[in-house]
């Protein structure tokens, strides 16, 4: 009998043939790994999961919990909430049969133009790393693996597959590697390598996969590639890249077997990769190591024994974080998941401005004019591979009407946020075959023969790896009946990539080829081109609609098909829409305008071209504010946008992409039932010209991080420019006073304890985020003006004082100089409630370190 799980795993590796081992190192399909029944190894399922766990398919028939975006979670500054968020994600993964969650995304928000920032936490490495560590621990307590991504410096989307990032050592270690180190030291079982190159070497071949990842941080898990990121056989195999996704086709397979046999790649390198994969399988429960399991599967246990012994079960494994005994595997109910989503959404809502309008009285205003496309159809998540399909989305209109059943809530859609279509709601469609709500989807072969027919309940469909073999056409058919609020003429359309043919009542109305914006998977699937046609509709006379999509492009050949049937915003005069909305606002006690970004603005696959709100939303806000001085603006975006009217309205709330319960959460905040607990995890500029680090576009294939260690608020402080709202900013419904700052001498392990008292001086319970920053103005080396060193979210009743202790680890005093070094002497310690609101100051004296 072997003494440890690792010894048993090594024995199993030695008993496999080269072909068996190599086969394990490329995915079986888009979302799962290869099984090896002979050793009790089942396939492991991987799924995107930064803000909800999709599972192996996007399918409304198996919906997912849509949690608030990563920026919303980061805005809570609450590690306990991050832990609970991770626990719910693990429960969702188990419900979906998922072993590996592909998250958290812990790239930094280097420039506010980054198109995927909604999926990442912050511009600050410490805040990002602390949240990531809490999430990773919570997910893995349930024997589901977490996957910090994208390692490393994939902080942009433009040319992400080919761009080379050029940066100095200090920026690399102090900023971009730091969150990954925190996640790995928290016990992460996987790390995802990025598409981009760093210093001329693509990340799936980069020596950074070895040092510092494995040599300095002791990472013993699996390095999985981003999808289709591995481009080579020998170079990637000789690097510490372990698993190629997706499969079964890839650059390894038979070519890697040949490379090993020729001596170009040592077999020992393959053995190490397989060992890591088996270790992951054992951790998530995908590998049965018992003798009986091996014998039941026909495996020769003597062969295992000949390599050092037989397999074992339930013996200690060398784990950064111990595998739990299963006692933490209790399911989270649907209700509990939705309540957590609601809590996080409220806790992450940032009150940017309040002139006394909020909170409303518990009974609410008598009449409320709710204005804006996002008030009716909120963006609950960003676009791209992380998209999930929730069972239900609560809009602000829904939330207010539920919270205030006696109030008069009137609605105006405002102005279009973007071009494109909104998927037809289930209630407006009838499957012509069954007569039930929904549509009929059929895959046809080249001769028109039916390969698959199914009823679907959503008009936005994504097929990933589930397209039948031989399919040449996807056909959608439904009977469309417009809703009661639809105009007499609608623009009915389709979004997709490929040749599109649409018929209405048997007449061809569209026959064209559509392309997709952005790059590869994310944008091509979630922001494709649109074709639409105006159709006169009568609610008493529904119309038959048939759409056919030819499956001829590269994505379809890879089994990736996406199509949406919906209505396009009518091409009305924006000025007329603004006037209508303002007139409505003038009749109400108060007005709420919801503004935001669209899927063509914030999505995986491309970066933003401007920070301005799309369309005529700025004009809309100003007109409504003139018509009703009690105007509250809600910002529904994943990252910073410009708010030029911010001083012209009564209140501004930032809800990010708030998840499926965002409407309930926002109603809770407006009515004061819940504190707007958020504080900014990123700096919000007043103008685009003020932003010190803006470009996300490579020059001749190279993106140069010329700013070094000065990104985010560090860059703003260095430039001496005042933003609209600084990092860490956020108001509440109470007032606070911080006092009694004390800074300890370094403890034996180098930790410096910062203590203070936080007193709620307001008339109601509230939340505050106490933030501690360091500075070293007399430093002999280049440093930021200030940098975040620690934080704590605290709550207190009216008049209550609470003690706060924030421990500063030695690393926050250190800088990178070929290794971690600490400049001896006094560091200024600043405590307060944002990077610029720091009323308390002390000093920490530290010795040299390295």
Question: Predicted segments — roles?
Answer:
Residues 1-816, 821-836:
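Glycoside hydrolase catalytic-domain context in secreted enzymes
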Residues 837-850:
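Short beta-strand elements
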